[in-house]
A protein has these predicted regions:
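Amphipathic alpha-helical scaffolding segments comprising HEAT/armadillo-like alpha-solenoid repeats
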Residues: 556-567, 589-601, 621-634, 653-667, ...
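Short inter-helical turns and helix N-cap capping residues of alpha-solenoid HEAT/ARM repeat scaffolds
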Residues: 571-572, 604-605, 636-638, 670-671, ...
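Acidic/His-enriched low-complexity segments
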Residues: 30-277, 401-402, 417-419, 435, ...
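Bacterial N-terminal signal peptides
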Residues: 17-27
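Non-catalytic accessory/interaction domains
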Residues: 246, 327, 422, 435-618, ...
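N-terminal secretory signal peptides that target proteins for export/translocation
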Residues: 1-12
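Structural detector for internal amphipathic alpha-helices that build alpha-solenoid repeat scaffolds
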Residues: 548-552, 574-588, 598, 607-621, ...
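Hydrophobic alpha-helical and helix-loop surface patches within well-folded domains
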Residues: 210, 242-490
Length: 823
């Protein structure tokens, strides 16, 4: 699963949230029930489920018949307990005989006439109806959005399948499935497995029959139905389905252009062919996540559809989410975590294979840069540091999503570094084949790798997976000219407490002198260690952990001359990026600015050019400004780099000559994203005519409303209360949802005494649109009005919020109380 709004590192200019909000967004949990960190004990095995669903669109109700085949797992099984929430059970048979049953708030309990023996099989048929609050969602036209295509879709992870099917709803069991979906004749449906047929019914509806012949965990069952447009293709004889809401079909080709290449890459590198009967990718409206890896049938948010007009401006498009969800078809679906505490076995692998796709398709530098950026982001999320990846003390599998995703991906990166490519991919092949169709825990992964490579990994898994944190190094060196020797002192400075200890890690040290370079492997395992290396002269450059092989922070003070040499000459992207960032701490040094200017113009990799521009924006001064202007106007530069350059211009608030230059970029640049960045920077520098420029830009039409949204965002940053009426108007129901998001966040910053703004934001809390519900919470928190505390508390008490939304609401209440000093 991809969490909502995760984006790769070239997209800073497209995000309409502050760094604080972004860190919270990246921690946003799935909309599931409270997770059980230990796998359940079971007294039966669910072997097959056949579900027929009918839908009442007007009432947003479902009617279902579930035929579930089970086998007892022990003797004397007197009753069967199915997970079921909010469903009215209308009738039930066991082996064809009507049977009494009882229900609780969370379960359907079925007593057996005679206690079952181990291996004894029974067939349970359940007739039911309900109006699901979770799990299954109706997206329908209403008075605000009358053109909205009709859609129904499900989201089972973590434990929400129980809201539309009475079923065993925990990942440590697998079942084959069949879904029969009776829908309007013009609709398309997607579900797991093979389409067995479509039958016309007497009432004018059609029933689609989907059959999943290989077992899956029930949270991976999927139903999608609605007014969709489908493009069909095939890969090695396997049907491919590309499905989008009607009206979005012009985005199909630009959004799915790499699917076949991804299938080739993953199948061949893992030496495990894609394992399912089809691969469908369906984009749906108002999805509660970025993407979900339902077996053979991924569901994705329409937010990730790639507008063909903007495709050339976006480095990877929707590749990151599509590669993530496709990787899950092996890691998460073919082999599935047994319990939620081991969810990193799903998400860490999918995150890693996002990077692997980028490495193979866009180049190793791209992948290295993304890992470097995510490392810094992970360390900024302080709450993650003291918690291990496998954490059985949490009842929410994604409370610490940054560990499951980001750190999980980094662990696999480090494992590949340690094992080498041949052993790493051999081990993954062995892991998948040995555990094919099984539910696993971390010990199964470790065992498979050890058996495939004859490598003991106890220490690796102990410190990186079962314990918390990562090493934080303080490094220094001295050069002894007489002895021709370098002494390197390494201290681990992380606070050793709880599950955070000292780390034992291999480190590559590279030393460059005028006569050449040489690398030395060392092992750091103590609180303080020193190492000596021969050197025929004072070093031009000393690299600690060349290439960023280890998840860590490093404080390593070096002279400007050394850092400039590293920026120009280090072989790897992370080492050059580290040098650029370190140079940002040096003020009033013309040589530093000149070196960063050279990097911004001439470095071979776009990410280093971007980092140099960011650092120049931080340093400031006329020379830095001229360098940034040069990058912004360089028509041969990549649009996402020019976007970053234009963002930096917003930091030069004292230069009145910038206003017309930014206005020209906003009006004339060939890239929409660069024009959008210019509008935001016009607001940041508070240009004399900024208000009029931004109001005029709100009226502009552009693909996906890129310019309007940037102008709305800019009006919030400008801080001119004249914009309140305009922004409130654009936040109203009926406006484009992305524009509403921008308007809500923007107006939250204006006229703090205006209670009408707070009332408007509060009124959006109960709208039936996830995109609105999510962002208005942050707008309310940013506004800081204590009048919102009671409505937020009422929302919590209502029970109408998911576990993920609950954590966000609680964050905003705490933020508001902190500002008022209340408890």
């Amino acid at each position: 699963m991809v969490l909502g709004f995760r984006r790769p590192p070239d997209t800073d200019g497209l995000l309409l949230v502050s760094a604080l909000l972004l860190s919270l967004v990246l921690l946003f949990p799935s909309a599931g029930a409270a997770d059980e960190p230990y796998a359940r004990s079971r007294n039966y095995d669910l072997q097959n489920v056949r579900v027929h669903l009918w839908f009442d669109l007007d009432q947003r109700r479902i009617r279902g018949e579930a035929d579930e085949h089970i086998a007892a797992l022990r003797d004397n099984v007197a009753e069967l307990k199915f997970d079921s929430v909010g469903l009215t059970i209308q009738g039930l048979t066991v082996d064809g005989m009507p049977t009494k049953f009882s229900t609780t708030g969370n379960n359907l309990i079925i007593p057996l006439v005679h206690p079952a023996r181990r291996g004894e099989e029974h067939d349970i048929v359940i007739r039911y109806e309900g109006q699901p609050k979770k799990g299954l969602y109706f997206i329908l036209p209403d008075k605000n959005y009358p053109e909205q295509p009709r859609e129904i879709w499900t989201q089972g992870e973590s434990e929400d399948t129980r809201y539309y099917i009475p079923i065993y709803d925990y990942p440590n069991d697998r079942t084959t499935s069949e879904m029969l979906l009776t829908v309007p004749a013009s609709w398309i449906t997607i579900s797991n497995g093979r389409l067995m047929g479509v039958k016309s019914e007497a009432d004018g509806t059609k029933t689609w029959d989907w059959k999943q012949s290989e077992p899956l965990s029930t949270y991976l069952i999927s139903v999608v139905a609605g007014d969709f447009v489908q493009k069909e293709d095939s890969w090695r004889g396997i049907p491919l389905r590309y499905v989008v809401p009607r009206g979005q079909e012009y985005k199909i080709d630009s959004s799915f252009d790499h699917t076949k290449q991804m299938l080739d890459l993953f199948s061949e590198k893992l030496d495990v062919p894609y394992p399912w009967d089809q691969y469908a990718q369906t984009f749906v409206d108002d999805f509660v996540e970025g993407g979900m890896e339902n077996t053979s049938a991924t569901t994705l948010t329409v937010r990730e559809l790639e507008n063909p007009t903007l495709a050339a401006e976006d480095r990877t498009g929707s590749d990151y989410v599509e590669s993530h969800e496709l990787a899950h078809q092996w890691f998460g679906d073919l082999v599935t975590c047994k319990d939620w505490a081991d969810l990193w076995l799903n998400e860490g692998f999918a995150t890693y294979f996002e990077h692997f796709w980028n490495e193979q398709h866009y180049g190793a530098d791209d992948s290295a840069y993304e890992f470097w950026r995510e490392q810094a982001q992970w360390f900024r999320q302080k709450r993650l540091y003291s918690v291990p990846i496998v954490d059985r003390n949490s009842t929410d599998s994604e409370e610490y999503a940054g560990n499951i995703y980001t750190k999980g991906g980094w662990v696999l990166k480090m494992l590949r570094e340690q094992l080498g490519d041949a052993d790493f991919f051999r081990a993954l092949h062995y892991y998948l084949e040995t555990n094919r169709g099984q539910n696993v825990v971390t010990a199964d992964l470790q065992k498979s790798i050890e058996q495939a490579t004859s490598t003991n990994l106890d220490k690796f898994f102990h410190q990186w997976v079962y314990r918390a944190g990562a090493p934080q190094f303080e490094v220094s060196y001295t050069y002894d000219d007489a002895a021709h020797q370098i002494k390197l002192v390494v201290n681990q400075t992380q606070k050793v407490e709880g599950l955070v200890g000292l780390f034992d890690v291999p480190i590559q040290v590279e030393i460059a002198t005028p006569s050449g370079r040489k690398s030395y492997p060392i092992e750091v395992s103590e609180a303080s260690q020193s190492f000596t290396f021969p050197a025929d002269a004072a070093p031009s450059m000393v690299l600690f952990d060349k290439g960023d092989a280890i998840l860590k922070t490093v404080e390593f003070k070096r002279s400007p001359v050394e850092l400039i040499y590293q920026l120009k000459n280090a072989e790897t992207v992370p080492d050059r990026a580290d040098a650029a960032v370190a140079l940002g701490g040096i003020k009033d040094n013309s040589e530093v600015v000149a070196a960063l200017t050279d990097a911004a113009q001439y470095d071979s990799f776009w990410g280093i050019r971007a980092e140099a521009l960011r650092v120049l924006g931080k340093i400031g001064g006329p020379n830095a400004e001229q360098a940034i202007l040069g990058a912004a106007g360089n028509g041969n530069e990549k649009p996402w780099v020019r976007d970053i350059a234009v963002q930096q211009l917003g930091k030069f608030k004292e230069d009145v000559s910038l206003a017309p230059k930014l206005a020209a970029i906003a009006a004339n640049d060939k890239a929409y994203r660069v024009r959008a960045a210019a509008l935001r920077s016009i607001a940041e520098i508070k240009a004399p005519n900024a208000y009029d420029t931004l109001v005029a830009a709100v009226k502009l039409e552009s693909p996906d409303n890129v310019l309007r949204n940037a102008a709305v965002d800019g009006l919030g940053a400008l801080g001119d209360d004249k914009a309140v009426s305009l922004l409130l108007d654009w936040s109203l129901p009926g406006k484009d949802l992305r524009t509403r998001q921008a308007a809500m966040l923007a107006v939250a910053h204006l006229d703090r005494k205006n209670k009408d703004i707070t009332k408007a934001l509060i009124s959006y809390l109960h709208e039936p649109y996830f995109d609105v519900n999510f962002w208005v919470l942050f707008a309310i928190g940013e506004r800081g009005d204590p009048d919102a505390i009671a409505p937020l508390q009422d929302l919590l008490n209502s029970g109408d919020v998911s576990l993920g939304e609950r954590s966000i609401v609680e964050e905003q209440i705490a933020l508001l109380k902190g500002r008022t000093g209340s408890k």
